[in-house]
Amino acid sequence: MKKPKPNLKINLNKYLLHSSVFAIFTEALKYRFIIDLKLFYLILFINFFLLFKYKKVTLNRFFLSFFAFLFIHGCLTYLWIGIPPNFLLSQILGIALASSYFYNVLKLFTKEEVFILYAKYALILAIIGFPGYFFGFNLNVNYDPRFSSLLTEPAHYAIVVLPACYFYFKRKQYVSFFIIFLSLILSESSIGYIGCALMFILPYINLQRVKYALGVIPFVLVIFYFVYSNNEKVKTRFDDTFESLKVLETGKFDVRTNISTYALLSNLYIAKENFIEHPLGSGIGSHYYMYHNNYKKKMRTPKYLYTLELDDINSKDATSLFIRLISEFGIIGILATFYMIILIVRTFKDKSQIVEQSIGIYILLKLFRDGHYFPPELFFFLLIFYFSYTKSFFFKNEGNLSHN
């Protein structure tokens, strides 16, 4: 087979870079026909074909060991509990496709090329969202008036663009920072507000800057109190969540429990029950099955949620990645989470690790809010973080994005 001409190589690399970064913002671009036909999957299919034809598709030992663990752990727990294997296979297949794709694309470029382009796309996404927000027309399929630009919901928008917001802030590109930061405020997303707070708190958590951190915390509390006092949605969610924590023991929800609180606490209750009975977890992809077949009958769900057909809301992703890891991997999931948090904290001790810090904020928010294993952006961020942080031979250039 003839090798592609130099111009073709350049154009192909440019296409792979731009299409792959663009793909992480395409969660809402889908068409429902029996299953969700997503633009993200189409991009992966086309680009995988190009990679196989013109590049070298590889997997390293870490990937093979990781997939082997997921498969063996899943097989053992599924057989022991009696869970149908389709839950296991669908998750492993999705993770394998998304992770191997980004592994083989990202290794073709430097971190600078990848992350700077991601930040530019995030900025464009924010700018596109302002006309729709201020003039009152939706750019998306949802009917939520809050800021979400082209993404599925305000919370998902906040999680995806927050790394870019932090990146611009640390690079002192304040105009770009302010544009994205303003969009995060307008999203009125609790997870977005938490992420904004983390941007200013996490860089100062080392012992040498404890005094500064203590000074910032009251400022953050004042902002939270202001938002709490003036935003009825945030106030309702916070009050209901605080009052409903006792449901983790009983599983009996008050008839007035709001949807967001129910989504979080019902999945946390299921994860707790599953962890008690299966300390090593029930296997990847099993939370949904355990929710419906084992533990949902123990709960008292508000009747209005049955009317709205939301009685099992977020049961597929457990509402948060941490809750899902507890449910499906038990002690192993807890240890993996703490290990990841340690890695994230360490990045903030090195001023040069701006990219790693940016992604660290994303991971923390992901642990708290979204439990899906392969949304478009997840392995894009995870692979940059892991291989960059461990100094593995992955990118063409191991230098950090620390220069101005």
Stretches with model-predicted labels:
Residues 15, 61-65, 166-236, 349, ...:
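Hydrophobic alpha-helical segments of polytopic membrane proteins
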Residues 1-15, 54-56, 171, 349-354, ...:
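A juxtamembrane structural motif centered on a specific transmembrane helix
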Residues 147-148, 258-329:
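Long extracytoplasmic/lumenal interhelical loops at the membrane interface
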Residues 48-55, 69-127, 347, 365:
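Transmembrane alpha-helical segments and their membrane-water interfaces
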Residues 42-45, 340, 358-367, 371-404:
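Transmembrane alpha-helices of multi-pass inner-membrane enzymes
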